[in-house]
Amino acid sequence: AYSGYTSGAKKAVVKSNQATITKMVGSKAALCAVGEAIDYTTFNGTKSTFSCPVSIDNFIKYMNDTIYGLDFKSPYDVAYPSWCKINVTNCSPPGYMSACPSHPDQLGYLSIFKHNNTTIKVCSNLEYTSGKTVYIENLISFE
């Protein structure tokens, strides 16, 4: 029973991280669409600002830097030291993922990447069950 509770609690953290990060990226994308300056966190944890408009690729990099800099981590054990943050497969310099985190050991990991020229995808690895990875995915419009 305890392991079931722990498993449920870890999944709840993954869902919470996905929701929090999706809301943050979505709100910053909306502000960017109207030309606002955007506050973000650099990968080393310092606060900074960028001016809009920016390319979708640069916006995604700023968002990935923010997730890394805010020190989000997976609630699961980290399989490899290079996977030091929720959104990287290389710790230093940060190696951000360009697709959903598909490795079975990437439970709780999240990626932010370009879905197409006007859409950003936020994707979390919720669980690995019956030989398949289960994802939580959200799309964010980027104008």
Model regions: which residues?
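N-terminal alpha-helical signal peptides/signal-anchor transmembrane segments
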Residues: N17-E36
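Amphipathic alpha-helical segments typified by the pilin-like N-terminal helix
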Residues: A1-T22
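Periplasmic/extracellular, small/polar-rich flexible segments of pilin-like filament-forming proteins
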Residues: A30-E143
